[in-house]
């Protein structure tokens, strides 16, 4: 059971004051706030375990961004190595799910070798202030200026999926000897899992044109968004050893030639196909009560149609019951989305055109329901997890007081703005800690015995 805990801390920071606007959904009014502007197409945004937004920019930069202040800490600059043109550049990124013990970051990007545009997937290690390349997992993937794919996701079995586009070569998605136009599955060291459809190949599914969204929902289903040509953008369910039709089939199997191909080639039809096209980008599952219109639904950021699509599924998760479009034209083209544990939604914008005519003019926006008040979900046998931390702000060398209700036990973790763990204490009931740390903004996290978590900011003056 997930429990949501409110700890109210006011931090006065001039940097945190941004222009705000409101957006009406059905019955919920969302407040938007500019988190960070001046970005060069934020292609991937991830809510990190340090409560920062991790971001790739297409021209070749990776940063951690403080969602409260917008402060950007550059971890990696490969702009001299990354090939950026049209849709190519630094694209997908994923963090190791056990980041505290394995601070690995996986990043996919395009590069030039002679006159050839290629893709590679590299594993980096987070040092606390930067990213250091460790291994190249896959390289020499045929690329192009468009149709790159490059969305990454790590599954519960510690294997990783990577989407590759057709690289404008329609002969490759149906060629099982090519990794182009596919969903690839690999171990986290780049080796081939023995239970892949072909244990000698990374290929997990075939017939993809340009899949740019992959998400594993709580129901265990892998959903994927994919760009069609001039018709038939798709939302799919990904399955191993399935063929998704391209280039013979776009959208549904609904013509005689397509029907014949689908029957012979194990084609999986999409849940929905869009004509005219909408240009779907990334997807994510929203499971927080603060925005009822989004709760327990799949969100899709949309580029061409400049909106956020919200899907409700049947109980089995294999059929769409309702589809709603929100935020139409409010932020322009929407490239990516991530969600904070508080339920706040963060959107990466992509300007008003598919061409990057205005570099370093893109942004990350925050959406929140300011009317929402978190409540406790408890049972009679389980006491509420209540905690008070004071003073905040706190002076250097001063004692921090932590009060846990009913002598509960919890782990207290304090991180600096680079994500380094500076304090890790097991506490019970009332605890006093002497803070021997430098002045600055820190982030603390409580993890209780029954898995309840809460993180907030702490200012040391």
Residue ranges of model-derived segments:
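Blade/loop signatures of beta-propeller domains
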Residues: 20-30, 130, 191-197, 251-265
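C-terminal outer-membrane/trafficking sorting elements
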Residues: 381-390, 394-461
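Short, compositionally biased serine/threonine- and acidic-rich segments at solvent-exposed termini, linkers
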Residues: 368-376
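Beta-propeller fold detector
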Residues: 33-36, 72-79, 132-139, 194-202, ...
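Beta-propeller blade signature
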Residues: 119-128, 176-188, 238-239, 362-368
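Conserved blade-ending motifs and adjacent loop-strand segments that build the rim/top face
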Residues: 320-341
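Acidic, Gly/Ser/Thr-rich repeat motifs that build Ca2+-stabilized beta-propeller blades
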Residues: 20-170, 216, 221-224, 228, ...
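Bacterial Sec-dependent N-terminal signal peptides
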Residues: 1-21, 377
